[in-house]
């Protein structure tokens, strides 16, 4: 299988950063959302970001963050991208992109075909899109829930105006099928590379990368 870029999200320890780099990650994500077991403080994220090797993009994941929080994050943590994983409107996405001068990736939750309409709403204002499983009813977290969606919904979409990333329940066992079905050239995962909630596992990172390489 030709090269697929990997984003390991929800890193919270220095050893996670090293393991992600060794496993060939192209992106690493830091979560700023208190309801997530992967939540990091701003000083913690700064320490982690400074340890990321050159060539790996550092992404801050936020959920409906206000300017005060974003100002604090961007001023203290060296970043390459902001990931908006809440219910931010296209207007808010454009506003954040203009305010901070950083590339913005907007997450879009998918459960059925109608959810794909959001792609055309957000593509004009985002630098990338993250196509993730729609948040289950009652779930507190918008992502990182380990659930997949029907990948065939994306199979018919041949034209994308911005780069995109596939997320939602990806594992070493299913990622090859996911990539073949959707045509994704970038993938994002979090819970599948953990030994416990919020605790990343180097062996699982390596296994995921190997599955893509061998597939």
UniProtKB/Swiss-Prot annotation:
Enzyme Commission designation: 5.3.1.24
A Pfam family annotated for this UniProt entry: PRAI
GO biological process terms held by the UniProt record: L-tryptophan biosynthetic process
InterPro entries documented for this protein: Aldolase_TIM, PRAI_dom, RibuloseP-bd_barrel, TrpF_fam
Keywords, ordered alphabetically: Amino-acid biosynthesis, Aromatic amino acid biosynthesis, Isomerase, Tryptophan biosynthesis
GO molecular function annotation: phosphoribosylanthranilate isomerase activity
Pathway given in the UniProt record: Amino-acid biosynthesis; L-tryptophan biosynthesis; L-tryptophan from chorismate: step 3/5
Catalytic activity, reaction form: N-(5-phospho-beta-D-ribosyl)anthranilate = 1-(2-carboxyphenylamino)-1-deoxy-D-ribulose 5-phosphate
PANTHER family: N-(5'-PHOSPHORIBOSYL)ANTHRANILATE ISOMERASE
Family annotation (HAMAP family): PRAI
Family: Belongs to the TrpF family.
Listed name of the protein: N-(5'-phosphoribosyl)anthranilate isomerase
Organism, as annotated: Jannaschia sp. (strain CCS1)
